[in-house]
Amino acid sequence: MSGPSHVPVLLDRVVALLAPPLEREGSVLVDATLGLGGHTEAVLTRFDLARVVGIDRDPEALALAGRRLAPFGDRFTGVHAVYDELPDVLARLGLDAVDAVLFDLGVSSMQLDVRERGFAYAEDAPLDMRMDGSTGPTAADVLNTYAAADLARILREYGEERFARKIAAAVVRERAKEPFTRSGRLVELLYAEIPAPARRTGGHPAKRTFQALRMEVNDELAVLRRAIPAAIDAIGVGGRVVVESYHSLEDRLVKQAFVAASRLDVPEDLPFVPAGHEPALRLVTRGAEKAGPEEIALNPRAASVRLRAIERTSKGAAA
């Protein structure tokens, strides 16, 4: 994010989806990907009776959001954690259930804008890419230690990179001469290995590789796989989980979790649903919602967003 004036993707639609549970007195939203707090600010401004627990693994984002949201006083609580730690966070805060959980996945514009974090490929910077810069392996560690087959798998699965094997082989060859430490050298390698015709389509040639490395460094899919069921379990009756994803693998994972949670627990050919077998959750969005052309023109990042929401209708356990 370039600053507090940044408007999150699909903000109005997200707030509308959150409105039914958050209009209740004493309602609590967990903003599981706080960032600079754009969603939280909108919620606290719109819903006078709501409180927000904001989770972020990035200490810098948490500090900036805390300053931005200070005018709301004790209606906002910031927590340094990864969002799959949601059950522990709620237990520490003494919350048995919440009214809504929001995820806005992927790297924030703020992280892209800080050169030293190494998320962006437009400027030469240390190959870090950790959302929490105090712990875990860096992108340089991945490039310098992973076997060629593992590098190729990451690039293919997380980056959907057609030239994954070629790039992985080049990384292994070049790191034998000198370990990778900076993004500029990796970008040069990608320009050399990706054929010119392919470089002219599909955006910057480094985009897919940098995305794949970021997802690997931060274990994003595994974290999300644990977090979505935890969020569904955390909401009370009438509560909603809302997710914005920007990668096909993320959206597929969210879709599968939502469909499984809202599935009928009876044979498909049964002509009626017996009492007690109704699904405890329902899909709120019809498929994945997308941004319109006007928003995409103002914010190109919105082009890849996929928005889904689910609501708990009874106390029964999720599938």
From Swiss-Prot:
<comment type="function">
    <text>Specifically methylates the N4 position of cytidine in position 1402 (C1402) of 16S rRNA.</text>
</comment>
<dbReference type="InterPro" id="IPR023397">
    <property type="entry name" value="SAM-dep_MeTrfase_MraW_recog"/>
</dbReference>
<feature type="binding site">
    <location>
        <position position="104"/>
    </location>
    <ligand>
        <name>S-adenosyl-L-methionine</name>
    </ligand>
</feature>
<protein>
    <recommendedName>
        <fullName>Ribosomal RNA small subunit methyltransferase H</fullName>
        <ecNumber>2.1.1.199</ecNumber>
    </recommendedName>
</protein>
<keyword id="KW-0808">Transferase</keyword>
<keyword id="KW-0489">Methyltransferase</keyword>
<feature type="binding site">
    <location>
        <position position="90"/>
    </location>
    <ligand>
        <name>S-adenosyl-L-methionine</name>
    </ligand>
</feature>
<keyword id="KW-0698">rRNA processing</keyword>
<dbReference type="GO" id="GO:0005737">
    <property type="term" value="C:cytoplasm"/>
</dbReference>
<dbReference type="Pfam" id="PF01795">
    <property type="entry name" value="Methyltransf_5"/>
</dbReference>
<dbReference type="GO" id="GO:0071424">
    <property type="term" value="F:rRNA (cytosine-N4-)-methyltransferase activity"/>
</dbReference>
<dbReference type="GO" id="GO:0070475">
    <property type="term" value="P:rRNA base methylation"/>
</dbReference>
<comment type="similarity">
    <text>Belongs to the methyltransferase superfamily. RsmH family.</text>
</comment>
<keyword id="KW-0949">S-adenosyl-L-methionine</keyword>
<feature type="binding site">
    <location>
        <position position="56"/>
    </location>
    <ligand>
        <name>S-adenosyl-L-methionine</name>
    </ligand>
</feature>
<dbReference type="InterPro" id="IPR002903">
    <property type="entry name" value="RsmH"/>
</dbReference>
<dbReference type="InterPro" id="IPR029063">
    <property type="entry name" value="SAM-dependent_MTases_sf"/>
</dbReference>
<feature type="binding site">
    <location>
        <position position="111"/>
    </location>
    <ligand>
        <name>S-adenosyl-L-methionine</name>
    </ligand>
</feature>
<keyword id="KW-0963">Cytoplasm</keyword>
<feature type="binding site">
    <location>
        <begin position="37"/>
        <end position="39"/>
    </location>
    <ligand>
        <name>S-adenosyl-L-methionine</name>
    </ligand>
</feature>
